[in-house]
């Protein structure tokens, strides 16, 4: 990073932890669905409604979150978002009725998506110039994973200390998350700088955001290239959530063992592979995050080909685990780098937030359709056919990533060569 390196690393860690754990109460169902039904009195259908309420609101708010990131103080927005999310969590800990929970979920979407999502990514990206984006975003993704994993393990330990029928157990977990959010919000106030100061540190022209910039962002080809790269990688991320089902149904692995593999892939790999992608861009000959994603996508495509070949006659569970882990590595390393692509493409800082918001809307669309499609295959087809279709979907997604990283890198190379040509004249 640049001047005052230690403070910037601390700032990056605080932003990353905040951005990572802030979603945990909104997605409480992922770990605590049974306790939610038992202690909060919701049916599984109602819990599904609670989740979909947040998801729909999030999709709507991704694009406006970019405008927020470009118009308002990063320090004030991140601090406010974390503290308000913590206060909402304290309300959630009272075990409110369904209509209140739905309102809380909408409020969570406002604080974590509208106020925090694009702001946190832009604030992190401004901690370095375009050549440092791979390192910054890689470590951001890894630190997010560390924060999520650490807090999840701690709250699970606290939850396990209570009797199975003690309703205080879930309440305590929610309160712990809420207090952590508020404390992180306070830390953000002292460590996160306002975007005006960061622009000055990077010697960039201070420009105010205008409504016409939204259309300008949509007219920039690299916005669409970055969006489609994220779209493809996120499709693989969604597919990996079925790894537990795949190992149990196709290889006969026990549910407990497969669940541990799910933790390794979804928690540990997220913490390790994001920084690893940044390290590759920093210390290898391939300095470009876009090129690294392309190489990882080729490796992922070969892995999916192997999974497709072994799908019809699975025999070695070790091979199945190895291939899933390899696919997980390519996915999480790419996730740690894809937000570096707009910065590498020299997106101006004054529209970086809007770019992130638009890329989020397009790139995260697989979150809407992948799960229903794969679920339909699982319900209507034999397991082997369902997972064959899933691997084919993944291959199509990575093929798209390879194409759009090629197009994006061509644009980046052209932009990099322009200053050199100008200086030689």
From Swiss-Prot:
Residues 1-8, 70-75, 118-138, 193-219, 281-291, 335-354, 410-425 are cytoplasmic. InterPro entries: MFS, MFS_dom, MFS_trans_sf. It comes from Escherichia coli (strain K12). It holds the Pfam family MFS_1. Disulfide bonds: none annotated. One of its GO terms (cellular component) is plasma membrane. GO terms for molecular function: transmembrane transporter activity. It is a multi-pass membrane protein. Residues 30-48, 160-171, 241-259, 313, 376-388 are periplasmic. The chain crosses the membrane at residues 9-29, 49-69, 76-96, 97-117, 139-159, 172-192, 220-240, 260-280, 292-312, 314-334, 355-375, 389-409. This is Inner membrane protein YqcE. To E.coli YihN. Keywords: Cell inner membrane, Cell membrane, Membrane, Transmembrane, Transmembrane helix. CDD domains: MFS. Its main location: membrane. It is found in: Cell inner membrane.
């Amino acid at each position: 990073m640049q001047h005052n390196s230690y403070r910037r690393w601390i700032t990056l860690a605080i932003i990353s932890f905040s951005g990572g754990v802030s979603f945990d109460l909104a997605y409480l169902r992922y770990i605590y669905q049974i306790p939610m039904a038992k202690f909060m009195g919701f049916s599984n259908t109602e819990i599904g409604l609670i989740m979909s309420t947040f998801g729909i609101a999030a999709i709507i708010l991704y694009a406006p979150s970019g405008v927020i990131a470009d118009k308002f103080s990063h320090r004030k927005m991140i601090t406010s978002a974390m503290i308000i999310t913590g206060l909402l969590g304290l309300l959630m800990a009272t075990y409110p009725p369904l209509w209140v929970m739905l309102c809380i979920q909408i409020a969570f979407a406002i604080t974590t998506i509208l106020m925090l999502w694009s702001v946190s990514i832009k604030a992190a990206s401004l901690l370095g110039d375009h050549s440092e984006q791979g390192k910054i975003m890689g470590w951001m993704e890894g630190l997010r994973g560390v924060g999520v994993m650490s807090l999840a393990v701690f709250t699970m330990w606290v939850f396990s200390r209570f009797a199975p029928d003690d309703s205080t157990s879930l309440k305590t977990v929610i309160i712990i998350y809420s207090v952590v959010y508020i404390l992180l919000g306070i830390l953000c106030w002292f460590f996160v700088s306002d975007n005006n100061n960061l622009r000055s540190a990077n010697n960039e022209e201070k420009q105010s955001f205008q409504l016409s910039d939204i259309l300008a962002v949509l007219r920039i080809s690299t916005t669409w290239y970055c969006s489609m790269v994220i779209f493809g990688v996120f499709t693989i991320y969604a597919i990996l959530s079925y790894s537990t089902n795949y190992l149990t149904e196709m290889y006969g692995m026990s549910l407990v063992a497969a669940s541990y593999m799910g933790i390794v892939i979804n928690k540990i790999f997220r913490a390790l592979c994001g920084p690893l992608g940044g390290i590759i861009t920093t210390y290898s000959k391939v300095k470009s995050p876009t090129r690294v994603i392309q190489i990882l996508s080729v490796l992922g495509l070969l892995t999916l080909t192997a999974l497709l070949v072994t799908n019809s006659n699975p025999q070695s569970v070790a091979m199945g685990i190895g291939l899933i882990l390899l696919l997980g590595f390519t996915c999480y390393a790419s996730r740690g780098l894809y937000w570096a692509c707009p910065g590498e493409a020299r997106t101006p800082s004054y529209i970086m937030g809007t770019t992130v918001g638009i890329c989020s809307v397009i790139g995260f669309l697989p979150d809407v359709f992948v799960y229903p499609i794969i679920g339909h295959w699982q319900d209507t087809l034999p397991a082997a056919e369902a997972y064959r279709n899933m691997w084919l979907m993944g291959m199509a997604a990575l093929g798209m990533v390879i194409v759009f990283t090629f197009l994006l890198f061509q644009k980046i190379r052209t932009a990099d060569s322009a200053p050199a040509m100008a200086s030689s004249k």
